[in-house]
Structures are given as C-alpha cells and as structure tokens.
C-alpha cells in the first residue's frame, strides 16, 4: 500500500478532508490494490481514479 501513497499522495496525505475520512481512503486504496493483482478489477480502479 505504501506504493499507492507515493503515486497518489492526495488520497492519503494532502487533503484535510481525507484525514477526516480514513475509512473511505482505505477503501479506495484497497480497490487500487485489487486492480494490481492478476485477475483484479482494473475497470473499477480506473473509475475510482477518474
């Protein structure tokens, strides 16, 4: 997950509203992590990122 923090720092570090919603942040990172694994749902991850 640390790799995602490097590429998407605003998801976990920069925005004050993110600090108030760590569960939502964890959910987004979990979706992105799932997309990285073989057979993961890339479409879902792209929708979240977009």
Swiss-Prot record:
Q: Which GO terms describe its molecular function?
A: mating pheromone activity
Pro-peptide positions on chain: 48-50
Membrane keyword on record: yes
Lipid anchor (S-farnesyl cysteine) at which residues? 47
Which domain of life, per UniProt? Eukaryota
Instruction: Supply the InterPro entries for this chain.
Output: Pheromone (IPR012597)
Its primary localisation, in coarse terms, equals: membrane
Q: Does the keyword Kinase apply?
A: no
The GO cellular component terms are: plasma membrane
Which compartments does it reside in?
Answer: Cell membrane
* Assigned keywords, A-Z: Cell membrane, Lipoprotein, Membrane, Methylation, Pheromone, Prenylation
How does this protein sit in the membrane? Answer: Lipid-anchor
> Which positions bear Cysteine methyl ester?
47
Please describe what this protein does. Activates B-regulated development.
UniProt protein name: Mating-type pheromone BAP1(3)
- The species this protein belongs to is Schizophyllum commune
Give the encoding gene's name: BAP1(3)
